[in-house]
C-alpha cells in the first residue's frame, strides 16, 4: 500500500510543474461561504418551525443542509479550498473591540457594551472555526486514525461550549432591544451551526480522513490532466475517473507478486527461522499469494469507488461491507502466515526447550491460536456491520440459558457438528466405525450425519452420538494395510528347517515390491514444508497414516502345530489390491515351505494305547 502511495506522489510531483499554468481552471471553494449557507438554512428551518403551514418544507431544507455539511466535511482537509476567514483582520477587530469594552465596562451605556460584547463573541467563534480547520489540516495526514479527528473535534467543541447566552434588561428602548435581540439571534444561530458541523465531523471522522492519498494530491488536477489527454468532449470527467480507477487496478494486480515477495522477505528477517530453507520460503509465499491478491483487488476496487464518488465520500453501507471483507481477508492472511511461520516458530521453541516440555501443549497452543483468530475476526465483522457485540455477549446469559434448555438436543447436535468439523475426525467418503455403526460417510449436516452401510442401507446418526464415542476411520491411511497370519507347521519339522523357513519368508517380504518397508515413511514421501517441523511435535507416520512394520518370528507351540507369525503391511490400502497382494504373499510362503520340505499342520489327535487285555480265540473262530 505504501508503494502505491509513493507512486501516486511521484505522479503528482511529475505533473506539479504544469499546475501553476492551469491553476486558474479550477476555482477554489470558500469553506466559510458554505458555513454561511448552512447557517441560512438553519435560520429558515427555525422560522418554518414557528409556522405550521410551512412545516412540511422543513424536511427538504434539512436534506439540503445535510448535503452541504457532507460536502463541507469532505473539503475540510483539501488545502486548495480556502477557509474564507481573514484571521489577521479578525484578530485586529478583536483588539479594537476589547479596547472599547475595557473603557466602557464601568459605564452606563449597556446597549453599546452588549453590542460590542456580541460582536466580539461572533469574532471569537469565527476564530475557533478557523483554528479548527487549520488544526485538522496541519495534524491529519494519510496515516491518521479516526480517534485523532475525534480528539481535535472534542477540544474545539469544548471551547464552543464555553460561550454563554445573554439576557437583556427590559428598560431598553424597543429599537435598541430589537437590534440586540437580532444580533443575539445571529450569534446564537452561528454558534449552533458551528457546533452542529463540528459534532458531525466528530461522529463521522472517516469522511474527513484522507483515503488513498486522494486528499493529499490534487485529484481535480489529476483528473483534468487525464481528461485533456482523452479524445472525449462529453462526460470527460466520468471517463477520466474510469481510466484512473482501471490504471490503479492494473497496477495493484501487477504488483501483487512483488508485494507478496517483499512481505515474505520481511517476515524472514523478523523471525529468522527460514534462512536455511529456501523451499519453505517459496511454499509460504505461495500460501499468501491468494489472500494478498484478493486484498489488493478489493483495495483497488475501494480506491475506484473513492474516485467515482469524489469529492464526496463513499456511501456508508459500501464502506461498512468493504470493511467487513477487509477483516475477513486479514484473518485469512494471518492464518496463512501462522501456518507457515507460526508453526515453525513454536516448534523451534519446543525443540530448544528441555526434554520435559510436553508436545501436547504445542498442539493445544496451535489449535487455540486458530480458534482465537476465528473468534476475533468474527467479532470484528459483527462490529463492522453495526452489531452491538457487548449486547450479543450479554444476551448469552439468562436468555441464552432458557433457549438452551428448550432446544437442548438440537444445540447438542449442532455443537457436536462444530466439534467434529474442528477435530476433522472424518470427511465425506471416509469408511468409519463408531459403535455398532459402520459404513461410508455420505454427508455431515448440522444435526445428523448420514452413513451408507455395506449392505447398502442408509443410516442417520446424530452428531452428538458420533462426538461422544470413539471413531475408527479406516480411510485415514496413506500407506499400509495390515496382513497378519499364523503359519502352522507339523511337529516333525526340524529346527534348522524352521529357521531357514523363517529367514526366507522375511527376505521375501522385505524384497516384495508391494509390501511396505523402511523407505515407505511419511518424511520420505511427503513434500509439504509444514511437516518438516511438525515431526518434532508428533509422529508424522502416525499422523498421516503410514505403517511399514514387518515381523516374521517363530511364535507359538500350538496343540497341533508349530506356528510362525507373519505380520506386515501392504503398500496399498485399497481392499481389492490388498487382497491381490495378500494372495501373492500366501503363494510365495507355500513355495518356501515346500522348498524346505516342511508340511502344513492341520488339527489332529494321536491316540496311544498302553496295554490291551488278552483275548483267547477258540479253535475255528474267525477274526
Swiss-Prot record:
Keyword Membrane on entry: yes
Segments passing through the bilayer: 242-262, 288-308, 318-338, 361-381, 387-407
SUPFAM superfamilies, per database record: Mechanosensitive channel protein MscS (YggB), C-terminal domain, Mechanosensitive channel protein MscS (YggB), transmembrane region, Sm-like ribonucleoproteins
Membrane topology according to the record: Multi-pass membrane protein
GO biological process: transmembrane transport
InterPro entries tied to this protein: LSM_dom_sf, MS_channel_1st, MS_channel_C, MscS_beta-dom_sf, MscS_channel_2nd, MscS_channel_C_sf, MscS_channel_CS, MscS_channel_TM-2
Keywords for the protein's UniProt record, in alphabetical order: Cell membrane, Membrane, Transmembrane, Transmembrane helix
Origin: domain of life: Bacteria
Name of the protein this chain belongs to: Uncharacterized MscS family protein HP_0415
Taxonomic lineage: Bacteria, Pseudomonadati, Campylobacterota, Epsilonproteobacteria, Campylobacterales
Amino acid at each position: 500500500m505504501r508503494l502505491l502511495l509513493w507512486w501516486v506522489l511521484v505522479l503528482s510531483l511529475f505533473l506539479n510543474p504544469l499546475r501553476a499554468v492551469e491553476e486558474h481552471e479550477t476555482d477554489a471553494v470558500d469553506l466559510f461561504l458554505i458555513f454561511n449557507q448552512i447557517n441560512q438554512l438553519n435560520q429558515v428551518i427555525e422560522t418554518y418551525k414557528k409556522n405550521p403551514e410551512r412545516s412540511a418544507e422543513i424536511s427538504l431544507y434539512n436534506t439540503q443542509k445535510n448535503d452541504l455539511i457532507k460536502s463541507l466535511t469532505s473539503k475540510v482537509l483539501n488545502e486548495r479550498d480556502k477557509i474564507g476567514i481573514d484571521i489577521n483582520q479578525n484578530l485586529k477587530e478583536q483588539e479594537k473591540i476589547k479596547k472599547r469594552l475595557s473603557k466602557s465596562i464601568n459605564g452606563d451605556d449597556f446597549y453599546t457594551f452588549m453590542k460590542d460584547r456580541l460582536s466580539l463573541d461572533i469574532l471569537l467563534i469565527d476564530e475557533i472555526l478557523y483554528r479548527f480547520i487549520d488544526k485538522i489540516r496541519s495534524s491529519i495526514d494519510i496515516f491518521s486514525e479516526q480517534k485523532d479527528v475525534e480528539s481535535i473535534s472534542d477540544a474545539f467543541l469544548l471551547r464552543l461550549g464555553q460561550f454563554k447566552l445573554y439576557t437583556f434588561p427590559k428598560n431598553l428602548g424597543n429599537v435598541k432591544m430589537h437590534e440586540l435581540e437580532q444580533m443575539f439571534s445571529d450569534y446564537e444561530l452561528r454558534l449552533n451551526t458551528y457546533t452542529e458541523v463540528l459534532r458531525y465531523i466528530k461522529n463521522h471522522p472517516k469522511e474527513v480522513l484522507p483515503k488513498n492519498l486522494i486528499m493529499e494530491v490534487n485529484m481535480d488536477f489529476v483528473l483534468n490532466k487525464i481528461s485533456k489527454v482523452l479524445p472525449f468532449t462529453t462526460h470527460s470527467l466520468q471517463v477520466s475517473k474510469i481510466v484512473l480507477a482501471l490504471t490503479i487496478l492494473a497496477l495493484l494486480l501487477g504488483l501483487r507478486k512483488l508485494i507478496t515477495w517483499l512481505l515474505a522477505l520481511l517476515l524472514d528477517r523478523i523471525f529468522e527461522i527460514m534462512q536455511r530453507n529456501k523451499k519453505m520460503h517459496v511454499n509460504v509465499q505461495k500460501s499468501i499469494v491468494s489472500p494478498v491478491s484478493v486484498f489488493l483487488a478489493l483495495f483497488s476496487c475501494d480506491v475506484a469507488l473513492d474516485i467515482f464518488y469524489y469529492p464526496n465520500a463513499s456511501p456508508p453501507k459500501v464502506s461498512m461491507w468493504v470493511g467487513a471483507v477487509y477483516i475477513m481477508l486479514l484473518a485469512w492472511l494471518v492464518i496463512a502466515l501462522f501456518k507457515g511461520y507460526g508453526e515453525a516458530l513454536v516448534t523451534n521453541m519446543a525443540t530448544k526447550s528441555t526434554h520435559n516440555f510436553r508436545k501436547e501443549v504445542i498442539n493445544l497452543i496451535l489449535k487455540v491460536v486458530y480458534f482465537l483468530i476465528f473468534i476475533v475476526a468474527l467479532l470484528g465483522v459483527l462490529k463492522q456491520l453495526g452489531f452491538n457485540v457487548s449486547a450479543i455477549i450479554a444476551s448469552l446469559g439468562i436468555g441464552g440459558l432458557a433457549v438452551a434448555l428448550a432446544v437442548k438436543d438440537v444445540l447438542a447436535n449442532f455443537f457436536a457438528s462444530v466439534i467434529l468439523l474442528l477435530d476433522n475426525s472424518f470427511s465425506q467418503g471416509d469408511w468409519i466405525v463408531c459403535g455398532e455403526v459402520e459404513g461410508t460417510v455420505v454427508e455431515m449436516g448440522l444435526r445428523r450425519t448420514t452413513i451408507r452401510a455395506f449392505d447398502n442401507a442408509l443410516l442417520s446418526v446424530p452428531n452428538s452420538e458420533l462426538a461422544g464415542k470413539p471413531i475408527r476411520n479406516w480411510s485415514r491411511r496413506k500407506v499400509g494395510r495390515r496382513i497378519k497370519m499364523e503359519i502352522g507347521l507339523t511337529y516333525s519339522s526340524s529346527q534348522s528347517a524352521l529357521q531357514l523357513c523363517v529367514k526366507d519368508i522375511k527376505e521375501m517380504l522385505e524384497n516384495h515390491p508391494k509390501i511396505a518397508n523402511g523407505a515407505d515413511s511419511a518424511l520420505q514421501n511427503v513434500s509439504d514444508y509444514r511437516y518438516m517441523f511438525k515431526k518434532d511435535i508428533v509422529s508424522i507416520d502416525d499422523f498421516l497414516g503410514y505403517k511399514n512394520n514387518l515381523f516374521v518370528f517363530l511364535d507359538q507351540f500350538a496343540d497341533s502345530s508349530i506356528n510362525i507369525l507373519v505380520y506386515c503391511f501392504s503398500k496399498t490400502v485399497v481392499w481389492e489390491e490388498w487382497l491381490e497382494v495378500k494372495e501373492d504373499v500366501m503363494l510365495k510362503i507355500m513355495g518356501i515351505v515346500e522348498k524346505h520340505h516342511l508340511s502344513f499342520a492341520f488339527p489332529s489327535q494321536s491316540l496311544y494305547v498302553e496295554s490291551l487285555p488278552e483275548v483267547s480265540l477258540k479253535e475255528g473262530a474267525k477274526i
